Design a protein with these regions (language model features):
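Metal-dependent phosphoester-hydrolase catalytic domains
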Residues: 32-44, 50-175
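A long, amphipathic alpha-helix that forms part
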Residues: 13-39
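Active-site metal-binding loops of divalent metal-dependent hydrolases
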Residues: 5, 48-49
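Generic enzyme active-site microenvironment
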Residues: 2, 45-46
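Short, well-ordered, mixed-charge alpha-helical segments that flank or form enzyme active sites
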Residues: 7-12, 53
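Active-site-proximal beta-strand elements of phosphoester/diester hydrolases
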Residues: 1-7
Length: 175
């Protein structure tokens, strides 16, 4: 699933219910596909969730939990959703989006536990999920600090940048 959930415009708390609704529908689709597909079925959700992985729409409505390397994934139901980019995994940059100097991981990657349990030929390469920050994606804010995404637009002005979000990526292997 490639996702772009509703914006935080108007306030994160006010708009959270719209993101929760979308996450509930996504969870229903994941459950349906996993129930129909049997062993070797996997789901991957990527995109702009317009919230951090630790926020209510992700934790409660999507029922995704942070994946850590010490997690006993073999004991999880295959349809369990796991967030790959969260507070415990963040390095540099500290998120995929920076607004008024505050970083957030709005761009997220979630996968079913089946992709970690080596069911079938396809699996996630553990530790490969990352927020991609290359020099040509960035600009320096006045006053210094860490480089931030080089926006395409600033208000109504075209700036010519790549995006206001850094991209994310992960590796899957097929054996």
């Amino acid at each position: 699933f490639v996702c772009h959930l509703p914006s935080r415009r108007g306030g994160a708390l006010v708009s959270a219910r719209y993101r929760s609704y979308c996450c509930t529908r996504l969870r229903e689709q994941v459950d349906s596909l996993m129930a129909q597909g049997g062993e070797g079925t996997h789901c991957l959700l990527l995109g702009d969730f317009n919230g951090d992985p630790e926020e209510a729409p992700t934790i409660e409505a999507l029922r995704s939990r942070p994946y850590t390397a010490d997690m006993a994934v073999q004991d999880l139901p295959p349809e369990s959703l796991l967030a790959l980019l969260h507070r415990e995994t963040r390095q540099e940059p500290p998120g995929s989006y920076c607004y008024q100097g505050v970083w957030s991981q709005l761009d997220q990657a979630h996968l079913t536990a089946s992709l970690l349990q080596q069911q079938g030929h396809l699996h996630y390469v553990v530790g490969s999920a990352e927020t991609v920050c290359r020099p040509f994606f960035t600009t320096q804010l006045i006053g210094g600090g860490a480089p931030v995404p080089w926006r395409t637009y600033g208000g109504n002005f075209y700036r010519g940048g790549y995006s206001d979000h850094f991209p994310i990526r992960l590796l899957l292997e097929y054996e």
